[in-house]
Amino acid sequence: LSRFLRVVNRVIHHIVLRPAWVLPLCSHKNLAMTLIASVSGIRGTIGGGVGSNLTPLDAVAFASAYGQWLRTQSGSDRRLRVALGRDARTSGEALSDLVVSTLRFQGIDVLDLGLSTTPTVEMMVPWEGCDGGIILTASHNPGDWNALKLLNAKGEFLSAEDGAKILKAREEGNFIFSPVSELGLRIAVNDGIERHIQAILNLDLVDADAIRARGFSIAVDAVASTGGIAIPMLLKALGVARIEGLHCEPTGHFPHNPEPLRKHLDEICALVPETKCDLGIVVDPDVDRLVFVSEDGELFGEEYTLVAVADYLLQHHPGHVVSNLSSSRALRDIAERHNSTYSASAVGEVHVVAEMKAKGAVLGGEGNGGIILPELHYGRDALVGVALFLTYLAQRGGTCSALRATYPNYAMAKEKMDLDPSIDTDALLARVAVAHQELNPSTVDGVKIDFPDRWVHLRKSNTEPIIRIYTEAPTQAEAEALATEFAAKLSSL
């Protein structure tokens, strides 16, 4: 034990001499490798060098910092508990062993959920009286990535202030480990997803009887991760008549790029009409993003997942809804249709949740297919999104494409502009805001300018010298033209 601790501390002091944000490296295969540490956790590519990739030693250092922060937060010597789950990435089991062992050496009990989903871990934290949680997933990043995503005692992502404390603890590296008589326990928990599904079935707005009566046939693309466990289990519990599984074995060998964008979804878009399914369901590796495919093989629209769920919920519970500044205007339109109100937050789940709490919102989310239902928990949850969407479709009748046709039709474009690292990005965005001050642009997160029938959102990256340009307009051509126009304006400024 003493030799292990000496090695860990030597490694930690080596790691913290390096910058704490983005550290690119070329491996022996000449592939760009990256480690990104931020207030929400640490993510990176597996392999390569310490401090430049997500290596075992980086994982130990970051887990140690999190464990020490939890101890400080508790303000006592009581036994701490952490819930931990992972997606199906091939590096996940080994990474889990490292993180669990590190926390145990800090005297922390770990409730190991094994293969799980991000929303399941989030819910298990308060259910099990845990002091925090860790999700091992790089979300929609490719399979050579992994990450430690950190939760507080509410099962929510950390605030910027708390995240900064963990980064500081990692930089200082003065970790204290427990004597052998006080090592934490590893406790296997095997029913997390079942409990999550039961909580969804208990919601008043989820009508399993209506879904069962409709006799749905549904195709599922789970990208060979844990959605292949959770989504079919949920559909069976809801009474879905037939499930066509596509990549539902959680091998972690992603069959296509795991980000649920149209260009990656040819297989399921073909499978749905070929097998005469009523719709298709696509989730990302950790099951917090949700995309539907209509019966004709066309995407329902990632931005419209939240719109459809809001349409259903606001008919029963009018109130306030929240999305981020880069999400479609369609959510605001639907809120107005139901005599409800809308506001936008900065990009990022933690900001959406903060705005929801401030406004007492009944629903929130992000345009990437993330649904946040505070009645269940404050986290993006594809499972509850599926249950609410199917309930609505079952109750109203008709097809997915017919439902989609009832919503305002907007098109989005996303671009990025590379900058010289010496450029003051904040000053550049400020000049854009001044140039359009008559339109009262939002500066909550970069600059967002609303025009009568379109908008543009410019925001700097926290990890790269670029500005991201998001636009929405009545047609795809107009959205792309607006993005090009503002890229040119940025260049001229």
Where in the sequence are the language-model features?
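An N-terminal, well-structured beta->alpha segment
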Residues: 27-101, 105-106, 186-218
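Phosphate-binding and adjacent anionic-ligand microenvironments
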Residues: 279, 317-493
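Gly/Ser/Thr-enriched, mixed-charge loops and adjacent short helices
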Residues: 45, 146-275
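Proline/glycine-rich low-complexity loops and linkers
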Residues: 113, 165-198, 202, 294-367, ...
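N-terminal small/polar loop signature for handling phosphorylated ligands or for N-terminal nucleophile
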Residues: 68-75, 81-145, 233-293
